[in-house]
Amino acid sequence: MPVISSYASGKYKVNAGIVQLAKSAAENARMIVKEFQGYTETEKLYGYKEMICYLTSYNDDVTEDDEYGDPWQLIYVFDGDDSTNVVCEGYSKAFQYLCDLSDITCYTVTGMMNGGTGEGPHMWNIVANNGKYYMADITNSDEGTVGEDGGLFLDTPISGSISRGYIYATDSANIYFAYDKEAKSLYGTGKNSILYMTQETYSADDLTAKPAKTSITGISNRTAGKLVITWKKAKSADGYEIYRRAG
């Protein structure tokens, strides 16, 4: 069988340098898992998401005509090279790999997505917890994407079903996800299917999934001695704490 050109040193021979790069990427992934070894499952999941989003960005230069290769693979996430980036498949495979190394039950699914980065054919993850299943779209949780402030990671849909697809709410838009035939065939369409998204809030290790981060939208002192601060509401937040740095 011919070797894909980006991995080949000949038509049927794998480039030894690429093999070493893959080994180094795998070791880097194991180091991330080791770094979060003492954390709870919920903290690991958030940590893995943040690490992946720190290590890579969405590859906007990839087109349908490009050869299937590294931008679709997890190597470009863990290779330590800031210039190598991935599409949704790379984000999803990287998250799946970290979960597999941590014995966290996670699945990778495919379908269509409307309203976010990589709109169209899409790959994302589903995380299992106590027999319930939760969205984990790492691609659209990255900085600059529709879900960077929450809504698409360990969140529940506002409406939908396996057959019709699910709608998730973010601060800026509602995002639609629909499973493809392959996902439905592989995992089934009944209420015991991993494709069935729960309405119960994610909670593990006595920790509820943390609210999305907020951001300051305005600061004013029009009234003497009175500082007024406004901020975006964070989904699932019970309250807010404000800290002032002195000096």
Residue ranges, per PLM feature:
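Intrinsically disordered, low-complexity N-terminal segments that are enriched in acidic
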Residues: 1-4
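Secondary-structure boundary elements
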Residues: 14-80
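Loop/turn elements at helix/coil->beta-strand transitions in domains of secreted/extracellular proteins
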Residues: 40-46, 54, 83, 100-107, ...
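Hydrophobic/aromatic-rich core segments of domains that either
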Residues: 90-169
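Solvent-exposed strand-loop boundary residues in beta-sheet-rich modules
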Residues: 131, 246-247
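Low-complexity, Gly/Ser/Thr/Pro-rich intrinsically disordered linker/tail segments
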Residues: 147-212
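Pro/Thr/Ser/Gly-rich low-complexity, intrinsically disordered linker/stalk tracts
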Residues: 209-238
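Short beta-strand elements bearing conserved aromatic residues within extracellular beta-rich modules
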Residues: 240-244
